[in-house]
Amino acid sequence: LPPAQRVPRWETLPCTNMDLKRLRAEVLNPARAGQPFSYLAYSCREGAYLPPVSCQPARLVIVEGSYSHHPALADCYDLRVFVTCSKAEQTRRLQAREGARYPAFAQRWIPLEEGYFAKYSIEESADLILDAEKGMIEATKS
C-alpha cells in the first residue's frame, strides 16, 4: 500500500502495509474462477504502482510473497509452500538485492516479517516447507 493508505503505526503491525481485500478481489478470486485478471503491484522503492500485469487463466497459479500466506487468504489456496533459508543466506541475498539500502531494510522489514510469521504461525501452517539453500522439501501435513 502507498504510505497514505496504511493504518497508523503500520510499522509495528504485521501485514498492515498490504491490501489483502484487493489481492483477493483482483487476483485470487478471478484466478480460482479460471478467469483472466490483472493487478498493480506497489513498489516501495519507486513510491508508485508498477505497470499492470495481465494474467490468463491457467491450471496452476503461483502467488508469491511473504504476506500471501495470511490466514485471511487461506481458503484461496490448494497448497501453501513456505520457502526458507538460514539467516546468513537471507542476509547475503538481501544485501545483494538492496545494496546500500540494506541496513534500513533490515531494521524495518525483517522484524515486520518475523513478527508476521510468529503471530500467524505461517511456517507451521504451510503444507510444504522448501529450504531454498539446501534444496530440500519437507511435507508438514499428511
Where in the sequence are the language-model features?
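Conserved nucleotide-sensing/catalytic segment adjacent to the nucleotide-binding pocket
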Residues: 1-54, 60-61
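NTP-dependent small-molecule kinase module
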Residues: 75, 79, 88, 92, ...
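Acidic, metal/cofactor-coordinating or nucleic-acid-engaging core segments within structured domains
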Residues: 106-109
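Flexible, active-site-adjacent loop/turn segments at secondary-structure boundaries
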Residues: 8, 40, 71, 114-115
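ATP-dependent NMP and nucleoside kinases share a basic, alpha-helical "lid"
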Residues: 46-97
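Short, surface-exposed, charge-dense and proline/glycine-enriched linear segments
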Residues: 20-24, 62-75, 134-142
